[in-house]
């Protein structure tokens, strides 16, 4: 049974698979080229060879969270090329924190914007464990650590869910944590070891004429969180389907259920959004679903902008997407005479147009010019692509 996978940052053709009971497999192309077990790694035999999480850090080191007596281990980049028949357990660095031993539902986060690493202890009673190894991988004596069973929120209220389920860093460096009672946000991850450390429970106003508000997805059992190219959060749940919320969490943009969409089940196990196409792949207990969203990863310039479908044929009634844009681009679509038909800002690197003019009528046959500009860049802007519409 596959638990997790991670691609080698230096070789997209090579990836590692964590499993229940069978350790880690190293795959290159379509061939298995390595197998990490109790013979050549810190993994123990039996159920303790479960590896629920595999992560590469910025230096290319391979980190694993696993179910044995150690909890977290790291294989340095320099040792990853050693044949697994010759590798020894001593080639790994082991982080034997007692708080995260025997963590068969572990989730490990190595942030890009902050120092501390985070481990979700997914069993009961749940906790979040943060540690700063200070780069001294051969000892934990100088590490800073903190085990959090209960969080104090921004209003100095104690928050103690039964379970912590998932963890994800967003594009601004804030850390989102899923729990059995809704999500919480760590807005200042580097403050985790300070006495003033707090989490944020996002409030959504009821808009009923009062000052009352409800916590975002209060008491909903969160199973997974994914951050897309526009920093929006896709939040999977155990019983309530899939939510898409705004970047700051203040607005629920969409709620997909088995009743109102093609979601096979309301029990969502995992969500992944392709950063190039914007397609969200949703795993459920009853099968897989796919949904084309309008947010993809932004580009550094306008050199690879394209529209699809293109040409737009007479029988097509859906959205026309322009992708490959810079973040938060101002996009205008005109005809060759300069008449404006559409204007808007991109979600991440993509924007969608319904093929209609500003009065809601389908545009006539012709070539339409797509202009794009970014206020946060000095990159040259202008016509970035063209769309042919045929009626």
Label each region the model flagged.
Residues 14-17, 25, 61-65, 116-120, ...:
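Conserved beta-propeller blade signature
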Residues 301-332, 350-353, 378-381:
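Glycine-centered coil/turn sites that cap beta-strands in beta-rich domains
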Residues 346-379:
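Short, surface-exposed loop/turn motifs with a glycine/proline- and acidic-biased composition
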Residues 3-12, 38-59, 94-114, 150-171, ...:
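Short coil-to-beta transitions that initiate beta-strands within beta-rich domains
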Residues 183-184, 266-300:
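Blade-level signature of beta-propeller repeat domains, shared across WD40, Kelch, NHL, RCC1
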Residues 289-317, 340, 390-391:
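Residue-level detector of functionally pivotal "anchor" positions at catalytic/ligand-binding pockets or at interdomain
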Residues 29-33, 75-87, 130-143, 186-199, ...:
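Short loop/turn segments immediately following beta-strands, especially the blade-tip
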Residues 330-341, 368-370:
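Short, glycine-anchored, charge-dense loop/turn motifs used at functional sites
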